[in-house]
Amino acid sequence: MLIDFNELSEITIPNMNGGEGKVIAKMDVNDCGRFIQTVIPPKSSIGPHLQETNDDINFIVFGEGIAICDDSEEILKAGTCHVCPKGSTHSIINVGDEDLVFYTVVPQK
């Protein structure tokens, strides 16, 4: 299976999960799970939300940010991977001057 994010439609989500600013995403949903390309512009964030049914795996490719998962703060930068396990609450904040870009995999279990 190949997912080509260049072929997917972009959606803009204002104040995602109560966060600041906007989030820009491209998503593919299939039998394996959800696969998402996400861009969080400077001064924007994804607000705190519960991972009710699956883990949330985020591979950072560009920019700087912070993930807060169950009150634990993690520094995000290119080459890092933030995992929020099922049952945990997390948020992602762009703390840099450039876009924070990452790919998320939410496996279907």
Predicted region positions:
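A short, N-terminal "cap"/entry segment at the start of jelly-roll beta-barrel domains
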Residues: M1-R34, G47
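Short strand-connecting beta-turns/loops that link adjacent beta-strands
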Residues: D31, T53, D97-E98
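Conserved short histidine dyad/triad with adjacent acidic residue
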Residues: I36-Q51
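Histidine-centered metal-chelating micro-motifs
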Residues: S45-G47, I66, H82, K86-I92
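Glycine- and acidic-residue-biased ligand/ion/polar-headgroup-sensing regions
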Residues: T53-G65
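Short acidic-glycine-tyrosine-enriched beta hairpin
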Residues: S72-K86
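Ligand-binding loop in jelly-roll beta-barrel domains
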Residues: K86-K109
